[in-house]
Amino acid sequence: MRFRLAVLAATGALACAGEPARTDAPARPAVEYLPMTGGDRLPFSAAARVGSMLYLSGQIGNDSALRLVPGGIGPETRQTMENIRAILARSGATLDDVIRCTVMMADMKEWGAMNQVYAGFFPRHRPARSAFGATGLALGARVEIECIALVPPA
């Protein structure tokens, strides 16, 4: 009787041990980071690519010397979009590859002026988009835009 109980207990213990770890689990996709140009002192990348997805960091209307362009929301939005276009080009993509944007604005009353410039950069399609008011944008910017693009294979 004791032998049967011991065998039963051992069988139960083995059954509870579970499956061995799987070795055929899919590999984690590689992440490629696109460095900032001229901004090595900044603690973030211009974009990160995972497979065919390109995630751009938020961009503001700064020039190559990292100074905000003068003139308010219109010129800032134009420069922001040009900065986005340049990052996309470094990854072999264009604005036509953008599928989503998030717009942060210091003053939502400037919505119309921002939209007028923004829309000119997407004449063939309009990416999905969210927008909200935000305080404390970098360098006192009026607008910051981040995008996600579906990019051609590397």
Question: Where are each of the predicted segments found?
Answer:
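Surface-exposed aromatic
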Residues: 99-101
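N-terminal presequence-like segments and the immediate start of the first folded domain
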Residues: 5-9, 16-82, 86-96, 105-154
